[in-house]
Curated annotation (Swiss-Prot):
InterPro entries: Rbsml_uS13_C, Ribosomal_uS13, Ribosomal_uS13-like_H2TH, Ribosomal_uS13_bac-type, Ribosomal_uS13_CS. One of its GO terms (cellular component) is cytosol. One of its GO terms (molecular function) is rRNA binding. Located at the top of the head of the 30S subunit, it contacts several helices of the 16S rRNA. In the 70S ribosome it contacts the 23S rRNA (bridge B1a) and protein L5 of the 50S subunit (bridge B1b), connecting the 2 subunits; these bridges are implicated in subunit movement. Contacts the tRNAs in the A and P-sites. Belongs to the universal ribosomal protein uS13 family. Residues 95-124 are annotated as: Disordered. The lineage of its organism: Bacteria, Bacillati, Actinomycetota, Actinomycetes, Mycobacteriales. The keyword Transcription does not apply. This is Small ribosomal subunit protein uS13. Part of the 30S ribosomal subunit. Forms a loose heterodimer with protein S19. Forms two bridges to the 50S subunit in the 70S ribosome. GO terms for biological process: translation. Keywords: Ribonucleoprotein, Ribosomal protein, RNA-binding, rRNA-binding, tRNA-binding.
Amino acid sequence: MARLVGVDLPRDKRMEIALTYIYGIGRTRSKEILAATGISPEQRSKDLTDDQVTQLREYIEATLKVEGDLRREVQADIRRKIEIGCYQGLRHRRGLPVRGQRTKTNARTRKGPKRTIAGKKKAR
């Protein structure tokens, strides 16, 4: 099993897909990496030679910010926005959608489950 930047790549997937298991690498970037290293996107990760694994590892470490480094950078950016008190920071602090989505309805993922509020009592 090939191991790159702390992630075990799935053995039976094509390299184009297997690389997307690394945080920070999607389909497009995966294709770019394979083109730059000269590895076929159709090749399975179990069929990689040690030289190819080394080549991939060196390319990714030299040119991309992935996994732990990228996660830390994203968290630092969020913390910085919260500290400076910008609008996006306030939205993060309140646990609401940050990018202008509606909140009257929807936004349940960000806001969490509904909190039921007692309605008006019926008059008799």
